[in-house]
Amino acid sequence: MNDDIEKWERGNGVRLLKKVGIESGQTILDFGAGVGHYAIPAAKIVGSNGLIYALDSDKHAIKELQRKVTRQELENIKLIETDGNLEIDLENSSIDVVLVYDILHLVDRREELYKQVHQFLRQGGLFSVYPKHNKLDSPGWGLENMTPQDIKKEIESYGFYFEGRYCGLLSHDNILNQGCILNFRKK
């Protein structure tokens, strides 16, 4: 892992996620957690009274995240390996925050994802999205024809209201680059 990413997981990521709205004691679902560039800083914020569900379909990423969790003695991260199916075994209204960071472009059935997120979130829960690879940010895959405004409207149509946008240095594929996070709340 490069030094920038290590610093990110130890400090800069923690500061950003606090700005985004993550707090001590929360239960968080990191959808597409990868090797934990967001799950690890989130775990440091929520502390021993909180819980992170780190979900991914990439077996290698899950193994690497498990190594990091063990090495850092993070007991509040629960790894969930999925086969890519959007059916996730979590209780309804049991999650405070859902992170969908740099993964939305890979989701074929976004409407199903939005419905699942809405189902899992508590009333007023935070749905935080980093829509990398949209029309204005390295276009590709399923978001290449959508602007952040289009994505905002799409998400709002599934029972969420827009809360705000946070821009800054974000983790993307083991490097840091400028990007923006869109925050929504469950109605």
Located regions from the model:
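A short acidic, Gly/Pro-enriched loop at the edge of an enzyme's catalytic core
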Residues: 85-97
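Short "lid" loop at the C-terminus of a central beta-strand within the Rossmann-like core
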Residues: 58-60, 84-85, 131-137, 170
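Class I SAM-dependent methyltransferase SAM/SAH-binding core
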Residues: 29-31, 35-86
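Core SAM-dependent methyltransferase catalytic element
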Residues: 158, 169-187
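A short glycine-rich, Lys/Arg-flanked "PGG" loop and its adjoining helix->strand segment in the class I
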Residues: 43, 111-126
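Short catalytic micro-motifs in class I SAM-dependent methyltransferases
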Residues: 102-103
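Conserved class I S-adenosyl-L-methionine
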Residues: 126-154
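Conserved alpha-helix/loop element of class I SAM-dependent methyltransferases that forms part
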Residues: 7-26
